[in-house]
Amino acid sequence: MHYMVIERFKDAPAIYRRLDEKGRIMPEGLNYVSSWIDHNLKTCWQVMETEDFVLLERWIDNWKDLMEFEIIPVRTSAEVVDLIKRKDH
């Protein structure tokens, strides 16, 4: 399952220092897909993938001192098309 993770940065320089020193600090089974950061270094929109939501919670525990999180389960457009087609039949 994919999740849109919206991160609201408290301290961008500290976040990037930790990222440089420790990496993403993700448990096995949680996969980083891609991310986009606004020009003001205040918000990051990140797509993560896992079959176990608990892994996402563990990852958040490693970063929650430096940012606030909003987690939204998402589907690809292709998945939605297939879902709608199945419901129509």
Question: What name fits each language-model region?
Answer:
Residues 1-89:
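Conserved, structured core segments of small domains
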